[in-house]
């Protein structure tokens, strides 16, 4: 059987009234109390009791010179072979450290702000990890896809050729796929990009030689030549 002695003290008064019937041993499990006694001493009102449980709560301690309710839950770990004495200083809730005992007990409320700041920092770090910046290859691929799509649309608007619109749309869709796969599968994405850029360079270069039109044939063919070299460089860098 473990014996536990709990002593409650107050910073403002040496007289405390202990209400053992308020939340005393408020637990759903059975706790056989063999003995309960009150002892008087200078500045303390010890409550001594014995129980078979190792964790015992104590609450509802009210000072004689205050109308505020001091609620304190005390949990102590006991050993079966000895007696432990715990001196309790109850925490008075006066809202942000004001009033009686505010300087001593109210300052602990700032810990929640630190936890909130830590949570916000963690959230910002997770957001920073999710929103990774685009690489130069992705930016060039995205601009290249936009240029090819606009070129196909311009060919359709000028000559009414649905073939130009379809070719421009499919080419832009493939380049968008390359854009999405570059961070995770750079070799595969660069290989698809080389094939697409080479095909566009040949087709648009041939059209430019016939029509001598700078846009879209001339601009797309030059951009395709640049992107072909860029994708080949990306493949070689990824393999090494």
Curated annotation (Swiss-Prot):
Q: Where are the transmembrane segments?
A: 164-184, 186-206, 214-234
Return the annotated region ranges for Disordered.
97-134
**Which residue windows does the record flag with biased composition (Acidic residues)?**
114-125
Source taxon at top rank: Eukaryota
* Major subcellular site: plastid
Q: Which Gene3D superfamilies match?
A: Transmembrane protein 14-like
The record places the transit peptide at 1-84
Q: Which residues form a coiled coil?
A: none
Q: Where in the cell is the protein located?
A: Plastid, Chloroplast membrane
Q: Pfam families annotated for this entry?
A: Tmemb_14 (PF03647)
Keywords attached to this Swiss-Prot or TrEMBL record, sorted alphabetically, are: Chloroplast, Membrane, Plastid, Transit peptide, Transmembrane, Transmembrane helix
The UniProt entry lists membrane topology as: Multi-pass membrane protein
* Composition bias, Gly residues: 97-113
Q: Does the keyword Glycosyltransferase apply?
A: no
Q: List the disulfide bonds.
A: none
Q: Which InterPro entries match?
A: TMEM14, TMEM14_sf
Biological role stated in the UniProt entry: May be involved in free fatty acids export from the plastids.
Q: Which family does it belong to?
A: Belongs to the TMEM14 family.
Q: Which PANTHER family match?
A: PROTEIN FATTY ACID EXPORT 2, CHLOROPLASTIC (PTHR12668:SF37), TRANSMEMBRANE PROTEIN 14, 15 (PTHR12668)
Q: What does the record's miscellaneous section state?
A: For all TMEM14 proteins, 4 hydrophobic alpha-helical domains are predicted. However, NMR structure determination of the human TMEM14A showed that only 3 of these helices are membrane-spaning while the amphiphilic N-terminal helix is probably located at the lipid micelle-water interface.
Q: What is this protein called?
A: Protein FATTY ACID EXPORT 2, chloroplastic
């Amino acid at each position: 059987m473990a014996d536990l002695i709990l002593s409650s003290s107050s910073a403002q008064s040496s007289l405390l009234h202990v209400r053992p019937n308020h939340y005393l041993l408020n637990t759903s499990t059975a706790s056989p109390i063999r003995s309960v006694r009150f002892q008087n001493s200078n500045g303390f009102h010890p409550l001594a009791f014995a129980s078979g449980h190792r964790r015992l709560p104590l609450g509802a301690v009210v000072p004689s010179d205050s109308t505020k309710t001091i609620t304190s839950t005390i949990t102590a770990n006991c050993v079966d072979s000895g007696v432990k004495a715990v001196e309790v200083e109850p925490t008075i809730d006066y809202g942000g450290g004001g009033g009686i005992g505010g300087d001593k007990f109210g300052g602990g409320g700032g810990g929640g702000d630190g936890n909130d700041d830590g949570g916000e920092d963690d959230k910002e770090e997770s957001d920073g990890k999710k929103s990774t910046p685009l690489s130069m290859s992705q930016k060039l691929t995205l601009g290249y896809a936009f240029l090819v799509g606009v070129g196909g649309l311009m060919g359709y608007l000028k000559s009414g050729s649905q073939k130009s619109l379809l070719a421009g749309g499919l080419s832009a869709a493939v380049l968008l796929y390359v854009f999405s796969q570059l961070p995770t599968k750079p070799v595969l994405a660069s290989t698809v990009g080389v094939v697409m850029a080479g095909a566009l360079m040949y087709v648009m270069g041939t059209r430019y030689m016939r029509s001598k039109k700078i846009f879209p044939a001339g601009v797309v063919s030059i951009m395709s030549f640049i992107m072909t070299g860029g994708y080949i460089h990306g493949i070689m860098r990824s393999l090494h």
